[in-house]
Amino acid sequence: MEKQNFVVLKNICKRFGSNTVIGNLDLEIKKGSLVTLLGPSGCGKTTVLRLVAGLEKPTSGQIFIDGEDVTERSIQQRDICMVFQSYALFPHMSLYENVAYGLKMLKLPSEEVRQRVDEALKIVDLEGMGERYVDQISGGQQQRVALARALVLKPKVLLFDEPLSNLDANLRRSMRETIRELQQRFDITSLYVTHDQAEAFAVSDTVIVMKQGDIMQIGTPQELYKAPKSMFMANFMGEANMFQGHFDGQQIHINGYAIDADLEVTRDKPNGEYQIGVRPEAITLHTQGSESQACQILKSAYMGSMYEVTVKWHDQELLLQLNSAQFNHTLTQHAYVVFNPRGLFLLPYAE
C-alpha cells in the first residue's frame, strides 16, 4: 500500500524584502520516508527547512503536517525536532541533562523522563555515558547526543540541517549510517538538508535537487545519477563526458562509434539528435577495437580504489574511472574506448 503524503508544501513563496528566495514551490514527503534537499549554496534548501520548522513564515502558500495546516503555527506547535550542524548542546549540562531537557519542558514524570533518556542514549550507543559533559566527548559523540535529544521526544517530523558538516570523513560515513538506520527503525518522516551528494545518496529515499529557489529534479539517488533531465543535473550529480550524437531507434551513434541502445536509457526517446552523456565509470579501455574507438592515453592518477585516466578521443579529452584490474596501460599508448550502454543518458540537443 502506498504511503500517504505526511508533509506537504503548496505554492510556497518566500521573499526577503525584494529578493525572492523561494518561488511557487510544491513539495511532498511521504510518511516514514527520508527526503533530502540537495543543492549548491544559496539555492534555498535551508530556507525550505526553516519554513517546515516554523522558524520562517512563507510570504504565501500553505504548509501541512499530518493533514493539518500548520502555516501559522510556531515551531513548538508543530511536533517536530531539529538536528543542527552545530549540535546546539548545553555545555554546562551533562549528556543526560541535554537529552532530558525537552522532556522536562513537557513536565513529564521524572521516572518516565529517566526511562526515555536511558533508552535514547542506548539507541545511539552512548549507554552509561550520561554523566559526562560535552567537552569530554568527541564530535561524533556530540552529534549522537543531539540525535538522541531529538529522538527522545518522538516527534512527528525530524529535520536535519547539514548535521555532519563539522565531522571528518570517517565520522561522516559512520554517522550517516547511524542516521539512516535509526530513521528506518523508528519510521520517522524526515527532511534532510545537505550540499554533499554522497551524503544525500547514502541517507535518502528521495532526493530533491534545488537551484536558485526552484526544484530542478526529484527522484531516487539512482534516478538522478543515471537519468538527469538537464545539463545542470548532469554536471551537478557527478562528472560526465558530453557529446553530440544521434539515436536511430536501435543504436546510439557518437563520432562514428555505434553503441547498442539500452531500453532503460532510450525508453520514450524518439529518433533524432541528442546531447549524450557518459559517466567516467561507464567507459573502459580495450587493446582492440574499431577505428572509431581508438584513443590515446594522456595521463593517469592513482586514487587508491581506482585510477582516474584522461584519454584523447576524436579531439576531445575524456575522463575515465577504472579500477586497478581494468587499467594496465602505459601513458601515450593507444587503446580503444568501450562505452557501457547502461552508463549513457540522453538530453535534448537544443538545450
Curated annotation (Swiss-Prot):
Record's catalysed reaction(s): Fe(3+)(out) + ATP + H2O = Fe(3+)(in) + ADP + phosphate + H(+)
Gene Ontology MF terms: ABC-type ferric iron transporter activity; ATP binding; ATP hydrolysis activity; transmembrane transporter activity
Domain ABC transporter: 7-237
Highest taxon in the source lineage: Bacteria
Membrane topology annotation: Peripheral membrane protein
Residues annotated for ATP binding in this entry: G39, P40, S41, G42, C43, G44, K45, T46
GO biological process assignments: transmembrane transport
EC number of the protein: 7.2.2.7
Main localization (coarse): membrane
Pfam families attached to this UniProt entry: ABC_tran (PF00005), TOBE_2 (PF08402)
InterPro entries, A to Z: AAA+_ATPase (IPR003593), ABC_SmlMolc_Importer (IPR050093), ABC_transporter-like_ATP-bd (IPR003439), ABC_transporter-like_CS (IPR017871), Mo/tungstate-bd_C_term_dom (IPR008995), P-loop_NTPase (IPR027417), Transp-assoc_OB_typ2 (IPR013611)
GO CC aspect terms: ATP-binding cassette (ABC) transporter complex; plasma membrane
Protein localization: Cell inner membrane
Function: Part of the ABC transporter complex FbpABC involved in Fe(3+) ions import. Responsible for energy coupling to the transport system.
Official protein name in the record: Fe(3+) ions import ATP-binding protein FbpC
Native organism: Vibrio cholerae serotype O1 (strain ATCC 39315 / El Tor Inaba N16961)
Gene: fbpC
